[in-house]
Amino acid sequence: MSRRSISRKPRVLVDTTFLLPALGVEVEEDALKAIALFRKLEIYYLEVGVLEAMWKVLKAIPPEHLEVVKVGLNSIRNTYNTLDIPAEAYTEAYRIYNEGHKDYIDTLYYSTAKTTGTPWLTIDEEFIEFLKQHNYKIEGIIYTPEDLKSIIR
């Protein structure tokens, strides 16, 4: 269920990387700098991104720190908005996966951003290059942290 917002802030779908710090998992400096700008954006996430984040938590967070994870999960859910993945996005993600990018979650993020018109913030340069090489549209669909300052009013 999405939180409704009457703000006119730019909408952005965030990659799993940007959920990880709330769960106690370290990320790249570029991601942390982008997160500092989130208050100026209307942030969306995918539930599959939370699942992907939990796979990283299983590897990085010891059991005695699970309370941090729980607080972080609640924070994500209470602060950001969920974005439902349209059926069309699932099938487009399948096609992209079959073209050679073997991370289905990445392909879901991209296809959801494209289908819903909610740009996707990612630091995954390898996937961006894959999309370019396969003639997928990037402009207006994918943002990198460097792009954020130009879209914030």
Question: Which residue stretches match the model-derived regions?
Answer:
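Short, flexible helix/strand-to-coil boundary loops that buttress conserved ligand/catalytic motifs
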Residues: L23-G24, V57, Y97, L131-K132
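Acidic, PIN/NYN-like endoribonuclease modules and their adjacent C-terminal/linker elements
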Residues: M1-K9, T115-R153
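PIN-domain endoribonuclease scaffold, especially VapC-family toxins
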Residues: L32-E99, T107-T115
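Short, well-structured N-terminal submotif of metal-dependent ribonuclease cores
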Residues: M1-Y45, A60-V71, K149-S150
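Short, surface-exposed amphipathic charged segments that create phosphate/polyanion-binding patches used
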Residues: Y97-G100, I151-R153
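Anionic group-transfer/hydrolysis microenvironments
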Residues: T17, L23, G49, M54, ...
